[in-house]
Amino acid sequence: MPYRKYREKKYEAKYREAFRAFQQKLGITFTNEKLLIQAFTHSSYVNEHRKKPHEDNERLEFLGDAVLELTVSQYLFQKYPTMSEGELTKLRAAIVCEPSLVRFANELSFGSLVLLGKGEEMTGGRERPALLADVFEAFIGALYLDQGLDTVWGFLKEIVYPKINEGAFSHVMDYKSQLQELIQRDGSGNIEYQILQEKGPAHNREFVSRVTLNSVALGLGSGKSKKEAEQQAAAEALRKLKEQS
């Protein structure tokens, strides 16, 4: 056997062992292990090893991107029943953006498993954010093809959804959503908004709103619309709760 082929087989055997250990760590066993390996195969590796172009992870990345958007959308839709479409979209974008995906990938040491060409390896590709985000999406695509949506949901429940529950993305929410998320996380009870006052002429109305937690007043706010008044009341409530914590 030519030395080059011997070296490649030894290299691939080492990675197969690493992928088995990775599956044990996740508690997931792929029926088709080739899908798992493909999810971590960068185009530079395919080019250098004269493999077919479709054997890299780009198609799986395409699929995983769609699966990730669907599952995260469903989770947010169920978790925040009163959140507006605009706020849901903004929150989802923060969860599936490149920096977030890189964070998830790094927590599971995805970079150490990526199959790279020598050039990409030498230029630090293993730690390149865009590459890691792509690999995370490709892994989601491979997991979906191999085991279906339920397993993807279970994986995200362990890796991604806890970050949402811990408030990691609260900074992109409006004040009402932030307050709702904080109350849900602490299990403190129910919040309600009440318009206490409407004043001024029809063309220049001002509304005063109060937000309560279990019937105890948390904050007051005013604005040119009911929505704005409620947002300001929620902002005051958040300030008070953060001062108390």
Curated annotation (Swiss-Prot):
InterPro entries: dsRBD_dom, RNase_III, RNase_III_dom, RNase_III_sf. GO terms for molecular function: double-stranded RNA binding; metal ion binding; ribonuclease III activity; rRNA binding. SUPFAM superfamilies: dsRNA-binding domain-like (SSF54768), RNase III domain-like (SSF69065). Residues 19-148 form the RNase III domain. Keywords: Cytoplasm, Endonuclease, Hydrolase, Magnesium, Metal-binding, mRNA processing, Nuclease, RNA-binding, rRNA processing, rRNA-binding, tRNA processing. The keyword Glycoprotein does not apply. PANTHER family: RIBONUCLEASE 3, RIBONUCLEASE III. Digests double-stranded RNA. Involved in the processing of primary rRNA transcript to yield the immediate precursors to the large and small rRNAs (23S and 16S). Processes some mRNAs, and tRNAs when they are encoded in the rRNA operon. Processes pre-crRNA and tracrRNA of type II CRISPR loci if present in the organism. This is Ribonuclease 3.
